[in-house]
């Protein structure tokens, strides 16, 4: 259950990052509210996951999901540039996440 909570927490990190971008410096009410609700839920699920997962594993996976997810949303939704170096960086992050998962005791 901790891994499911951690995965959802990571996805919610992507949601709040995207909503924050849409909030235009917190000047637009709906994206601002979505940002803070998603942050609250993301942190809550991360805290739940940390009850049974090691700190380093949980935090690394959470930030990794957020980083790669924001990268993908930036490209797919916002039309950000795709370069070989950026894609390689995302692949390395995902590789690290897989290694953290397979080496975790929980």
Language model features with spans:
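Polytopic alpha-helical membrane proteins, predominantly small-molecule transporters/carriers
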Residues: 1-106
